[in-house]
Amino acid sequence: MIRHLLKVCGIKGKVLVCLALLSFLGGLAAAPALAQTAADQQVLPGTPAGSAPPEEKKETAPSTAGPMITDTAVPIDTGHVSLSVLSALSCYPGFFNSNWRTVTAGGNFYTFYMPVKVTYGPAKNTEVYLIAPFIDYWGNNVSIPGPNGQRSASYAGIGDLTLMGKYNLLPEGDVMPAVSAVAGFASIPTGHASHLNPGLLGVDAIGTGALTFTTGVNLFKWVKPFLLYSNIWINSPVNIYQNNSENVVSREYITFNLAAEYPLTPKFVALLEFYSNWTWSNIYTPQGYQTPETLLGIMPGLEFLATEKLSFEAGASLDLAGKNGVKKYTPMLTASYSF
């Protein structure tokens, strides 16, 4: 057929037919390349063909200094150490009687309280901390004078130590809070509590005289924009006296604390806490031994994150209600540094 066309069209026809044939063959060769280019356009730049799209990074809670009274649930990082120093000044406007009413304190009493807290993470999901408080307790214009007519007195020293351990049982989930188990000694009787001097009007009692074993759970949940904390502890004190050959089991009590943080800016965080202790008797508690004390209060505060490692907190605890215990108002300031 091609020879027939060449004969009919002559030399010019030969040229035209050759050009047409070359164009047809070139189109066949270019078709696969065009198809490959079109397929390549379906793949995002920098993404291998057939790979899954990258997962979105889960949003985490903002950094805060943590509550001042309520214990945290998430342990410190492994191998890290933090140091916290709290300064608090308590004044006592009265006492709570057995009917939940406030009665006179019988004088002007004050306490300067400065605990130093050292926290360490020995292993993953584990934390231990030690609290050593310095206490200065004084009073004046006391209504009932001492043996020599004293109406004012003061006493200072180291109070009871606290040694606690914490282990994170469950991490925070989409619905479930983070849960940590807590166990240790809320009070180790290192503070002066026995053989009191009557001339010091009771202000030399800066310790409980009890070895208090504590166990419970700490909870944490970020419910945007709030960071929520809770403590539920049971405390079992055993009173130890040098002039008593047998240890005496004191009244057990429950500690129930709540705290909420609200980040105002990347540097400032608002804080509100509720604290309480609830006391009852068990079958081993001697009747009439240590009047059961119950206390409820709140503490508003403000946190300032100076750097990634240094933070400050200020607040004031206000005892709102109670039974058979002291009533006090306590402004406080905390400085914390993480190593």
Question: Model-found features: residue ranges?
Answer:
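Detector for outer-membrane/organellar transmembrane beta-barrel domains
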Residues: 78-86, 201-284, 337
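Transmembrane beta-barrel strands of outer-membrane/channel proteins
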Residues: 85-91, 130-134, 182-188, 230-236, ...
